Amino acid sequence: MSKKPPNRPGITFEIGARLEALDYLQKWYPSRIEKIDYEEGKMLVHFERWSHRYDEWIYWDSNRLRPLERPALRKEGLKDEEDFFDFKAGEEVLARWTDCRYYPAKIEAINKEGTFTVQFYDGVIRCLKRMHIKAMPEDAKGQVKAQHPLSWCCPSDPAGSCNQSMGSEDWIALVKAAAAAAAKNKTGNKPRTSANSNKDKEKDERKWFKVPSKKEETSTSITTPEVEKKEDLPTSSETFVGLHVENVPKMVFPQPESTLTNKRKNNQGNSFQAKRARLNKITGLLASKAVGVDGAEKKEDYNETAPMLEQVLHSL
């Protein structure tokens, strides 16, 4: 085999170069060249975002290698991959903050993993990716010195010798005003209550207001008339103080049912005894009349039979 790599457009046969490789599952992945064996004409390819145990030796003229496709340009203004490390340390840029807005910043250092250590204009230091950094316009680079921290420049004059005036269109002032307005809105707004806290409040209110059961309703319905009766009756003699006894109307108190039933029974018994006495009188008169009638009949029979017996005796 040739000791020189072939000329394949879009692929640079160098250690660290990026390309796409086909794995054993017939899927393409972005990869990176780890080692090159010029004697055998093959390369050790590492699949990005995968463990090194999946690294594989592939011949440099294999169909399993192809140029890395360019990713779609993002709205942030990403350029070609060749401009990955286009920024330099100490350069003024626009860096993205957590609110997805870009603010003036300064690159402090460039890290090996492709990230940038950035210091914002208010002194906050963060580590950002390349996709979260934009180039600052040339006409705005001079205006940053009017609002930058003292550590950016003027180390010999800590009191602040940078007295550049701000224009009416200074976007840094606009950024600060927007940040102040956002802070005021945050402090002015009331804190939102979650749905769980509202549910807890409803539960507490339900605990205080219990719905009475059927048994409780019946018991209360029975007791309420008794209570009303008790309320109608006078509780003490204090209510009649200052009134004459003659003028006070007599109170008719309702009698209990037991006394009424006893009176009814007594009345029924008395009436029954009276009826019985009447019946006894009537039966006595009837019996006496019956006895008198029987005696008269016997006498008549005797008077009729006596002459007959005498005739029979005489005939004998």
UniProtKB/Swiss-Prot annotation:
Superkingdom: Eukaryota
Cell compartment(s), UniProt: Nucleus
Xref: InterPro entries: Agenet_dom_plant, KDM4-like_Tudor, Mbt, PHF20-like, Tudor, Tudor_PHF20L1
Keywords: Isopeptide bond, Nucleus, Repeat, Ubl conjugation
Residues annotated as domain Tudor: 11-71, 85-141
CDD domains from the UniProt entry: MBT_PHF20L1-like, Tudor_PHF20L1
Biased composition (Polar residues): 186-197
A GO cellular-component term linked to this record: nucleus
GO BP annotations, alphabetical order: regulation of DNA-templated transcription
Major localization listed first in the record, in broad terms: nucleus
Pfam families in UniProt: MBT (PF02820), Tudor_2 (PF18104)
Location of the region described as Disordered in the Swiss-Prot/TrEMBL record: 183-237
Cross-link (Glycyl lysine isopeptide (Lys-Gly) (interchain with G-Cter in SUMO2)): 75, 79
Gene3D superfamilies: 2.30.30.140
Biased composition (Basic and acidic residues): 198-218
Function (record text): Is a negative regulator of proteasomal degradation of a set of methylated proteins, including DNMT1 and SOX2. Involved in the maintainance of embryonic stem cells pluripotency, through the regulation of SOX2 levels.
Subunit structure: Interacts with methylated DNMT1 (DNMT1K142me1). Interacts with SOX2.
Annotated protein name in UniProt: PHD finger protein 20-like protein 1
Gene encoding the protein: PHF20L1
